[in-house]
UniProtKB/Swiss-Prot annotation:
The gene is groEL. Its EC number is 5.6.1.7. It is found in: Cytoplasm. Residues 537-546 have a biased composition (Gly residues). This is Chaperonin GroEL. It holds the Pfam family Cpn60_TCP1. Its main location: cytoplasm.
Length: 546
């Protein structure tokens, strides 16, 4: 086992604090509408330019192991906030630094760290309760756009695009962000349920120019197994022909005689039909077929359920207003499923999302949820150069996460105002234990840190801004617009933050900072002393005169 280097009390805390400061100082320059960019060197390709706090934090690794431990703890704050709320990472870092700095001063002055932490926790709970109580539900698409705009650093186009996407696919819908091949940023919305399987034969195409098959008001046969012989299918095919409606067959595979007969029927005009393979694999395929069945008010024809293909009647088939089948994708638009059944299925998938521990499974479940709940929107981010596209994509990701959080828990006045107003609730806390009271005092001061940093990044003195907002007791939403350097009603001006983001940033910062303040010893691998290289043997041949 390698030898260890151990540091204690003040020595350990000083080193740790230096690491916290290095990371936090690099991250906090990005805060607010006038925050600066950070350029990150990449081992290959162009450097990356970003204003995303967590991206900066993840890149920082310090040479000194003890300083690095402090930096990594604060990096954990940014990562955790990013995982839960998807935004607010810089705010969380600024808060953590403020709590650790103040805490270290008190500990150096001889205050009990454990009581100090208790005070920090009490004050944090009071502030979180206050922020949650102030939250205002997001009612209009305009408010969604405002949240997106603020989080995208004042880029109105991004805010409006996200609001439009949410309007189209609903709050449960999937919105993905991709890099575009062009300079324009655009929104592409797929309504209905889409899965990545196309037609089994190009002969099913109804529009030869676009190479797509479009079926209006079709019946949908959902079959779990392979279809290779025609005989079992005849009764259901004849029943559909009688109605004069088209038929879509979704099965594990369709081959041989069955496929040939369907193609011949289609070409002769006897039956408008198209066939596609079922999406997914294994158990996931079963679940997705069941989703399609619920969406279209049909039944999955499965021998597990004791239903044989020859016994299938028309009521067992699904229905939809329209189905569009391309070479790679199939989209079912306006399935005729019962709303109550679809909602029950959505609830079931949500419960599975809560339970799963695998990120991959969670992602797949969310995709299924979105397809059932409304649709999929893709924001394609464009720019003149690759560096610009990556920087913009970071901002779109942040804005998207912020708007989701806003819809979930509501909005509060932005620009650090909500944290500053929460001081009132924290100031009411009183403890008989002086050391606990000191912890409350630390949080009181830390709650000012984000607004001070936003002001500083805008080139304004933070203390003046804090004083002016605190003195205005008439309006709870009165704050500082760093973009225009004016004092305004934050909600009316559309400067809002999601309550979830503000709450999570404070909770995560206080949690990690509390642990750092109570640190008394640090252990790291001792640096290895390299042994000197052996001397080179003398050159030439001994005993020979040249």
């Amino acid at each position: 086992m390698a030898a260890k280097d151990v540091r204690f009390s003040a020595d350990a805390r000083d080193k740790m604090l230096r690491g916290v400061d290095i990371l936090a100082d690099a991250v906090k320059v990005t805060l607010g509408p006038k925050g600066r960019n950070v350029v990150i060197e990449k081992s290959f390709g162009a450097p990356r330019i970003t204003k995303d706090g967590v991206t900066v934090a993840k890149e920082i690794e310090l040479a000194d192991k003890f300083e690095n431990m402090g930096a990594q703890m604060v990096r954990e704050v940014a990562s955790k906030t990013n995982d839960i709320a998807g935004d607010g990472t810089t705010t969380a870092t600024v808060l953590a630094q403020a709590i650790v700095r103040e805490g270290a001063k008190f500990v150096a002055a001889g205050i009990n760290p454990m009581d100090l932490k208790r005070g920090i926790d009490l004050a944090t709970q009071a502030a979180v309760k206050d922020i949650t109580a102030r939250a205002k539900k997001v009612a209009s698409s305009e408010e969604v756009a405002q949240v997106g705009t603020i989080s995208a650093n004042g880029d109105k186009e991004i805010g409006e695009m996200i609001a439009h996407a949410m309007q189209k696919v609903g709050n449960e819908g999937v919105i993905t962000v991709e890099e575009a091949k062009t300079a324009e940023t655009e929104l592409d919305v797929v309504e209905g349920m889409q899965f990545d399987r196309g037609y089994l034969s190009p002969y099913f195409v109804t529009n030869a120019e676009k190479m797509v098959a479009e079926l209006e008001d079709p019946y949908i046969l959902i079959h779990e197994k392979k279809l290779s012989s025609l005989q079992p299918m005849l009764p259901v095919l004849e029943a559909v022909v009688q109605t004069g409606k088209p038929l879509l067959i979704i099965a594990e595979d369709i081959e041989g005689e069955a496929l040939a007969t369907l193609v011949v029927n289609k070409l002769r005009g006897g039956l408008k039909v198209a066939a596609v393979k079922a999406p997914g694999f294994g158990d996931r395929r079963k679940a997705m077929l069941e989703d399609i069945a619920i969406l279209t008010k049909g039944q999955t024809i499965s021998e597990d359920l004791g239903i044989k293909l020859e016994n299938v009647a028309l009521p067992m088939l699904g229905r939809a207003k329209r189905v569009r089948i391309e070479k790679e994708n199939t989209t079912i638009i306006d399935g005729l499923g019962e709303k109550a059944d679809i909602e029950a299925r959505v609830g079931q998938i949500k419960a599975q999302i809560e339970e799963t521990t695998s990120d991959y499974d969670r992602e797949k479940l969310q995709e299924r949820l979105a397809k059932l709940a409304g649709g999929v929107a893709v924001i394609r981010v464009g720019g003149a150069t690759e560096v610009e596209v990556k920087e913009k994509k970071d901002r779109v990701d942040d804005a998207l996460n912020a708007t989701r959080a806003a819809v979930e828990e509501g909005i509060v006045p932005g620009g650090g105002t909500a944290l500053l107003r929460a001081k009132k609730a924290v100031a009411e806390l009183k403890s008989d234990v002086p050391d606990v009271q000191a912890g409350i005092k630390i949080v009181l001061k830390a709650l000012e840190a984000p607004i001070r940093q936003i002001a500083q990044n805008a080139g304004v003195e933070g203390s003046i801004v804090v004083g002016k907002i605190t003195d205005n007791t008439g309006s709870e939403t009165y704050g500082f617009n760093a973009q225009t350097e004016e004092y305004v009603d934050m909600i009316q001006s559309g400067i809002v933050d999601p309550a979830k983001v503000v709450r999570t940033a404070l909770q995560d910062a206080a949690s990690v900072a509390g642990l750092l303040v109570t640190t008394e010893a640090m252990v790291a691998d001792a640096p290895k002393k390299d042994s000197p290289a052996p001397a080179m043997p003398g050159g030439g041949m001994g005993g020979m005169d040249f």
